[in-house]
Amino acid sequence: MLSNTASHYGTITKLFHWTIAFGIFLVIPLGIYGNNLAHAIEANGADAQTVARAAFVFSLHKTIGLTILFTALARIAWAISQPKPEALNGDKKAEHWLASMIHWLLYGSLVLVPVTGWIHHSATSGFAPIWWPFGQDLPFVPKSDSTAHLFEGLHVVFERVLVASLVLHIAGALKHHVIDKDATLRRMWFGTTAVGPRPQQHSAKTAILAALAV
């Protein structure tokens, strides 16, 4: 089953979900490691091998980050076109509202983190290229230290929002699985059977438009 139903996530949604999750758990440690290398090089200097390793780590980080960006945009477009399976806790209005906000905060940060990183990359030059054939610069971004500094800071802020929303998202999934003992987590995995419908909730399109308005 490729598409969503009122009670089940389809294979395409699951592939988007787990591809993005895998990318997140790669890109964040790479960013931390790259920053640590950069700070060590700035503070103490380094040989050519260490500089080359830092450039490799940052290039990998940027390339995975842009892959996540375009995958997240495709995921959002797919969600708009699909019915959203009804929440298994739809009768718990406050909990359901909080889970929805965390979910779309997560997706908003999945867009904003790589976009701000991309702008920062475009405002600088000569270090750690993105591994793709489409060029390194955005046409509207000047080469500017102040622009680079601004978007570097925003990149860090949104990265922290991403981490916080990710932790809350995982905690909510575990709460459903361990405490509520419902199928919320299982139905996002492959090969699980559909569950019965629950109380009515807002569509994916409404949630996305609300998130974009924020």
Predicted regions and their residues:
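Membrane-embedded alpha-helical bundles that constitute the cytochrome b-like, heme-associated redox core
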Residues: 1-214
